[in-house]
A protein has these predicted regions:
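Intrinsically disordered, low-complexity terminal regions
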Residues: 2-284
């Protein structure tokens, strides 16, 4: 009898335990702090601007008519307490590295082990893996060379003509350009490459994505040589009526060797796994 009673009590305690003793601890509610930092530097036409972005956050770069570089950074931090947010704010930010014809905007933060070892040796370890991001907006002289290294987040580039090199980890990237020498590589996401004018001032562009989609928007009457290729799986969809075969194999679902109008600047679009859409866009 005692054995049966003991077993019954154990069973009751077992099923009642979730109400008396919670099986999981409540999640710690993180505080959020947002701040905006804006900096301006004098800068002549024809120089180089480098941005090393945050692991997460958007990047927008616009060309303008001033001899200045303007950097606006919207910084979002998360931490358990205000004191923790103060610690994070001291490291998750950006610094300038400048010389006569080159300005670098360098993101610092908990993602950079070398930086943390060098400048924040006593930083609390519990804060190292907390989420944070920086959304950058840069305005640069229109004739500027660019080097952009982005992480996870949208990228927009417009109104700049120069030598431009862009890399991103995961991004919806929008490039609206009328000239320059462009190289863009994205690991995963979507790249939309738009040319709003019929002529391109410069030698062309090389656009690559490992997995995802490349959209190519060409205006009516555009002139240029267009190549596209799918390396593994996927296809090329061409709905732009102005393309003609330039050399073998011509225009297929896997490879395109084509010419628009009178030809000229050279554009290459490469997808590892995904789709290349060549289509009619707006423009003048």
């Amino acid at each position: 009898m005692w054995t049966m009673t003991k077993s019954l009590l154990i069973a009751i305690l077992f099923f009642a335990a979730p109400e008396v003793f919670p099986q999981t601890l409540p999640e710690i509610q993180l505080l959020t702090r947002t701040s905006t930092r804006r900096e301006t530097r004098r800068f002549a036409y024809g120089g180089t601007v480098t941005l090393i972005g945050a692991p997460r956050g958007s990047v927008t770069v616009e060309g303008w008519a001033r001899n200045e570089v303007e950097v606006t950074a919207n910084i979002e931090l998360k931490g358990p307490t205000e004191a923790d947010l103060d610690h994070l704010a001291s490291v998750n930010t950006f610094v300038f590295d400048e010389d006569l014809n080159h300005i670098s905007v360098l993101t610092t933060g908990t993602h950079d082990r070398m930086f943390m070892k060098r400048t924040a040796k006593n930083f609390p370890k519990k804060l190292l893996n907390l989420p944070w991001k920086i959304d950058y907006r840069l305005r640069v002289p229109a004739n500027t060379d660019l080097e952009i290294n982005a992480g996870h987040g949208p990228v927009k580039l417009s109104g700049v003509e120069g030598s431009m090199r862009l890399t991103a980890t995961e991004s919806e990237t929008a490039l609206t350009l009328t000239g320059g020498i462009v190289s863009a590589t994205v690991t995963f996401g979507v790249i939309t490459f738009s040319i709003p004018s019929r002529s391109w001032r410069g030698s062309g562009a090389d656009i690559r994505i490992a997995s995802g989609t490349i959209n190519v928007d060409l205006p009516p009457g555009f002139s240029g040589d267009i190549d596209a290729e799918v390396l593994r799986t996927g296809k090329i969809v061409n709905t732009y009526e102005g393309l003609a075969s330039r050399e073998k194999p011509g225009i297929t679902e896997r490879i395109v060797r084509s010419r628009a109008g009178a030809g000229g600047p050279y554009f290459k679009f490469t997808v590892g796994d995904g789709t290349v859409n060549i289509r009619k866009g707006g423009g003048t």
